[in-house]
Amino acid sequence: MKKFLIIAIAALSLTAASCNLFGATTAGILKTSNGGVDWQASNILKDGTGSIAGLSISKIAFDPLATEILYASSYNAGLYKSVDGAANWEQILGQIPIIDFVIHPYDSKTIYVSGAFEERGRALVTRDGGKSWNAIYTAATNSTAVRSIALNPNSPEQIAIGLSEGELILSNDGGATWRLAQSYNDRINKIIWNSDGMYVVVKATGIFKSTDSGNSFQLITAGLQSAGNTSTLSIFGSSISSYNQLAISPSNSGTMYVTTNLGLYRSFNGGLTWQFVTMPLSQSSLAPTAIAIANSSDNVIYVSDGDIIYKTADGGTAWSAADTKSSGNLINALLVDPEVPQAAYAGVFAR
């Protein structure tokens, strides 16, 4: 099994520069402590050698056993960990551009990451908190990225990965063996696996749900795709061509929101029906991208559009907007503190 060594933080600038994504514009992590009124950069490296402000962030997540610990993955310089609420960061995996990661729900030292390395899509795992990493999946062809990875929370040895070419691949033994579950011939943007089932966000096709660990799937956005069901209120066009990110309420799995190229849609019945959510966007806005729902209330939602972060506290009737001043970059990831709902985090992608 191939081993991957951690790159020293001192080599960070070289790693990032080699990926052509490390520019002078502001990216990295932003944090709000006042419910989204304003956002501040939170990018200091733990050893004082610099910051992660130049990194393009792909995902942010809390340690499932300790919410003061956060992890952030980057498209250009690996995986980072903070033990003090994003005040300081340390690199625990370099060398591989990471698109997604997931932490074992009962063992925080076990972390799975997915992305691309040496021109191949790969999935890696550490079982010692990042001291060593092993490859558990390597794509058969070049130019294929592993875009998403998820664990079954009820049986974490079950792993799902989604490829850029559309293959959904499953393992029942922690990554020792794999089987092809579905082939969508369309990019898989995200896999979410919760106690209610597995959700696969396929870029131009829609959202699929499985309640039997990936043996069968139902398209839950079929009603949204039907002619006439997309809202005439959308300022971005008349047909959905990109399902971007899905957020499911932590307290009610039937409540979910999806960002698309036409705007924001929500369902209160697990995807049986969908409603368009009007946001204060302009014709010059980008389509909504990142989205997060607060644990404390599924009426509290953060949504990004370009470098603007919108917040609603009433499920989408009224919105406030905060300019993150991220130099026109894209807010690509959002996360709300499960214990302190006034605290939230944003990951910036440098465009």
Where do the PLM segments sit?
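Extracellular glycan-interacting surfaces
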Residues: 2-351
